[in-house]
Amino acid sequence: MTYLFVAAGGALGSTLRYWLSGLIAGAIGQSFPWGTLVINISGSIVIGAFATLTGPDGRVFIPGDWRQFFMVGVCGGYTTFSSFSLQTLTLAQEGQGLWAAANVVLSVVFCLIGVWLGHVGAVLINEGV
C-alpha cells in the first residue's frame, strides 16, 4: 500500500513542479534555470519542516503511509536533482561555465539553508513558540 501512496504523491509533486517551472520560466525567462532553483529551495524548506513536525519529537502525528506519501512522493516528485544536474551540464556545455558554477553553489547553499530553516521553524512550532 505504501507504494501506491508514494506513486500518488509523486504524481502530485511532479505535476506541481512542471506547472511552477513553466510559470517561473514564463515570468523570468530561461537564460538560467530559476524554476529549478526555486523548486529545490522551496522543496528543501517544506521537507525540512514536515520531517521535523511529523518526526518522533514532532507535534503532528502522521501515519507512516501518509508521511511517505508526502516526503518521498510529493517532495521527491517536486524537487529535481536530475533536472538540476542536466541543466548545469547544459550550461557548461554551452560555454556558460560561470552560470553553471553559480547554479551549483546557489542550489547547494540555499537548499541546505532551506532545509535548516524548515527544521528550525518546525522545532519552534513543536516547542509551542
Curated annotation (Swiss-Prot):
Membrane topology is: Multi-pass membrane protein
Q: Name one GO biological process term.
A: cellular detoxification of fluoride
Q: Which GO terms describe its molecular function?
A: fluoride channel activity; metal ion binding
Q: Where in the cell is it found?
A: Cell inner membrane
Show the InterPro entries listed in the entry: FluC (IPR003691)
Keywords from UniProt, A to Z, are: Cell inner membrane, Cell membrane, Ion channel, Ion transport, Membrane, Metal-binding, Sodium, Transmembrane, Transmembrane helix, Transport
Where does the record place a coiled coil?
none
Provide the residue positions that the database annotates as binding Na(+). G76, T79
Residue ranges annotated as transmembrane are 4-24, 32-52, 69-89, 105-125
- Give each disulfide bond as a residue pair: none
- Activity control note: Na(+) is not transported, but it plays an essential structural role and its presence is essential for fluoride channel function.
Catalyzed reactions per annotation: fluoride(in) = fluoride(out)
| GO cellular component terms attached to this protein's record | plasma membrane
Highest taxon in the source lineage: Bacteria
UniProt record similarity statement: Belongs to the fluoride channel Fluc/FEX (TC 1.A.43) family.
**Function per UniProt:** Fluoride-specific ion channel. Important for reducing fluoride concentration in the cell, thus reducing its toxicity.
The protein's name is: Fluoride-specific ion channel FluC
Task: Please report the organism this UniProt entry assigns to the protein.
Answer: Rhodospirillum rubrum (strain ATCC 11170 / ATH 1.1.1 / DSM 467 / LMG 4362 / NCIMB 8255 / S1)
Q: Which gene encodes it?
A: fluC
